[in-house]
Amino acid sequence: MVGHAIHGMIALGGRSRRGSRVTPTPDSTLADAQQTIADLRRELAESEPQKAAMAEVLGVINSSPGELSPVFDAILEKAHTLCGASHGVLATYDGEHFRAVATHELPTPFAELLRRPFPPEPGGPQEQLLRGERLFHAPGASVLTGPGGDTPRTRAAREAGQRAFLMLPLRKDGRLLGYITANRNEPGPLSDKQIALLENFAAQATLFE
């Protein structure tokens, strides 16, 4: 055996090791297949509510030709349901002012305040979106005070019980058309999957601008 390579052993002289190949056992192959099937079933189950929500939005579009208000209402409501958001708005931007065109589960005074045109607050979330930020995510209570101090909108948010805040832009061809928010009454971040869902609905909203 001296002078001959021995498979499965470490070669002398610092050469690389050659080992026997491990052949998957029937049990491991079956377990992998079962895990793959389980993953596919879970993904399918998770996608079904989104498909159903999109179908309902399409139904609203078909039943309200030329009317954008019910379409925006439907997009916002379905997005919040899937993301587990308590309340929020869908707002448009005319180049100078923002204005909510749909609100969901907001106290009436707060909703009316956001429906009035307002400029972006210096350093605020809307201004950050104008600078090109992908999103503004404030999972804690610090969102209740803006960088410029209290404003009528931040006070109304506090009175509405808002404790977590996510704002996503509505963009088309690089131009900011507005934003959509998903807010919660308990502190804590939205997951990447929930943010991705909201981005999908934001993309749908830009089709009607």
Across the structure, where does each feature detected by a protein language model lie?
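Allosteric cytosolic regulatory segments
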Residues: 199-206
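Short beta-strand-to-loop transition segments that serve as allosteric relay/switch motifs
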Residues: 106, 179-188
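A short, aliphatic-rich beta-strand micro-motif
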Residues: 163-171
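Signal-transmission linkers at sensory-effector interfaces
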Residues: 21-70, 81, 193
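Regulatory sensory and allosteric helical modules in signal-transduction proteins
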Residues: 109-148, 155-158, 166
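GAF sensory/regulatory domain recognition
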Residues: 76-80, 88-122, 131-135
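Short hydrophobic/glycine-rich mini-motifs in sensory/regulatory modules
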Residues: 170-180
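Short regulatory alpha-helical segment in sensory/regulatory domains of signaling proteins that mediates
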Residues: 49, 58-66, 75-84, 89-92, ...
